């Protein structure tokens, strides 16, 4: 039998449904892996092994209700949890306990899932790094801000974990750690109980090892129809190769990997053409900064005014910058974002998905930075579903991802395209 901790969520769900796997055995295997590797990877902010095993034993005694039944999940430490500390990656909240679960956490429990523990986040899910290391090379960053979730999934500690994305905080760490990162369409997963940064851009996303696993958890949470991946082999998707206005910031190996992928996708049956996003699309990183920092300055007003000495210099600089954004500038940035969303919808009339870089390159060496989020910011502003799939290797042997972007609200077709691209470029 395969090592149980290496099962995908979909594989584990099938075994549980068939009566061939107990949740307790699966959770125990994940906890064993954490015990072996956590001192190196440092992906977890809090784990209560006995509580996790107790949840699993309870699930084994209950009738199976959903595909999530008995499946362990990691929860980024920006979501409230009633039974584990919630510290938001900040010393301000060290030892903090909340009285209830975030909506998505409560849903996982309701659907029969097992909360394995809380994963490390950067400070308030911004850019000041946490303690986590990249499991592919411990001297390299795992990215951020969902760094613990990405590293835990990549290192076989848990089959799936929640992340959040306000800039590129699901896509970038997933790409750096060689896993699947899925940022759903804006608003698809309920955000109640998430530590807010930006009402305009905060997304709840997932880190998994397969695209079907990403579909599984979000479909169960959102009540959406089940995506069937049986038809993937016969697909002939219309894919736009989108360099984006920030192409020059990608390193040469990333550019070459994506350019060389185009004929491979065409041979596999896709219709691929170049899509340019010009004009106001080139302003979207600037737009993102104006909107997100304006909102962040207000969202963290309590922490900023009461505990300024416990906020990193990096974050305080961003907050103060947000305080200088005027209401007029904020509204103008929102107007640009709305116009670009409308223009992008026109692009998708002729394309099922776009393919673009997930990050500038491999995970940078060192733990003082989480890398540059430039290749996630635009898609976050545009509110569209985005999936990064691990399909390349860089010159240092570290993972490189390809980012598949679809039309707003078309998450299932986007996931199907992402799975098709993954198969076309890895098989």
Per-region residue spans from a language model:
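An N-terminal boundary/leader segment
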Residues: 1-46, 267-269, 329, 427
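Flexible, acidic loop-helix segments that line cofactor/substrate-binding pockets
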Residues: 42, 126, 235-245, 275-289, ...
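Structural helix-boundary/capping segments
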Residues: 36, 154-248, 259-268, 331, ...
């Amino acid at each position: 039998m395969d090592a149980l901790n290496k099962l995908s969520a979909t594989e584990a769900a099938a075994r549980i449904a068939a009566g061939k796997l107990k949740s307790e055995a699966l959770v125990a295997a994940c906890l064993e892996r954490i015990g072996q590797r956590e001192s190196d990877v440092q992906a977890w902010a809090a784990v209560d092994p006995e509580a996790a095993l107790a949840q699993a034993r309870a699930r084994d005694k209950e009738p199976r209700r959903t595909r999530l039944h008995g499946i362990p999940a990691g929860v980024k430490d920006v979501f409230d949890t009633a039974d584990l500390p919630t510290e938001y990656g900040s010393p301000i909240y060290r030892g903090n306990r909340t009285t209830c679960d975030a909506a998505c956490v409560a849903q996982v429990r309701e659907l029969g899932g097992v909360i394995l523990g809380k994963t490390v986040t950067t400070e308030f899910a911004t850019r000041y790094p946490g303690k986590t290391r990249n499991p592919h090379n411990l001297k390299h960053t795992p990215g951020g801000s969902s760094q613990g979730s990405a590293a835990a999934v990549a290192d076989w500690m848990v089959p799936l974990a929640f992340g959040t994305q306000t800039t590129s905080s699901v896509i970038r760490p997933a790409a750096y750690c060689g896993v699947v990162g899925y940022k759903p369409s804006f608003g698809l997963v309920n955000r109640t109980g998430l530590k807010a940064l930006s009402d305009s851009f905060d997304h709840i996303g997932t880190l998994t090892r397969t695209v079907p696993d990403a579909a599984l958890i979000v479909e169960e949470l959102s009540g959406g129809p089940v995506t069937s991946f049986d038809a993937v082999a016969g697909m002939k998707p219309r894919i736009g190769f989108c360099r984006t206005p920030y192409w020059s910031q990608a390193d040469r190996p990333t550019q070459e990997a994506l350019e060389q992928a185009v004929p491979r996708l065409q041979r596999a049956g896709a219709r691929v053409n170049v899509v340019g996003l010009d004009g106001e699309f080139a302003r979207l990183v600037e737009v993102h900064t104006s909107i997100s920092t304006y909102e962040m300055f207000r969202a963290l007003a309590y922490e900023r005014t009461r505990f300024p000495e416990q906020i990193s210099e990096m974050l305080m600089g961003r907050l103060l910058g947000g305080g200088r954004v005027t209401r007029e500038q904020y509204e103008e940035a929102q107007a640009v974002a709305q116009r670009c969303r409308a223009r992008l919808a026109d692009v998708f009339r002729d394309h099922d998905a776009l393919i673009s870089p997930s990050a500038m390159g491999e995970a940078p060496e060192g733990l003082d930075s989480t890398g540059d989020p430039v290749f996630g910011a635009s898609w976050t502003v545009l509110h569209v579903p985005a999936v990064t799939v691990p399909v390349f290797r860089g010159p240092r042997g570290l993972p490189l991802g390809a980012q598949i972007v679809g039309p707003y609200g078309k998450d299932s077709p986007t996931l199907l395209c992402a799975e098709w691209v993954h198969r076309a470029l890895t098989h």
